[in-house]
């Protein structure tokens, strides 16, 4: 491949890129204009294995709403919740028609974590960082921001400023009618029926 040469002319506001016989001159902006995420104290700092976070977000993101008027549903609600085995790290997403709720064991240090709504776009970008099964992700959470840090990349995002609805009210309680089905058989049956469904 060709050797790429970058030359910055801050006075003229130009960046020259040269590679082989190609030459590009790009307009630039002053570095002072780049938005800076102000450093702040995080209420909670903990580490979670990449596979755990991957499972939480992969199994909940399909239910994120795309309706902009209900902006508080445009993300995944990440919080600490009471579960059967004690406290759990929980992801919840809903679009008003579907609801996904996924639990994982609460990581050490996460007990005081405030509940936050992680935006849909942040979930998508975070997912790209979670493919390494051996990686530990450092998570820092405040009322306004969330940060995910790997050894090579740090992703910081504002959280959605809103109140996630009380999803527990729409989950049936005390239901005595329960059944277990083979997941692959059930998926195939739903797939066949879906071909003639208009909704």
Regions found by a protein language model. Name each.
Residues 1-199:
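Structural preference for solvent-exposed beta-strand-turn elements
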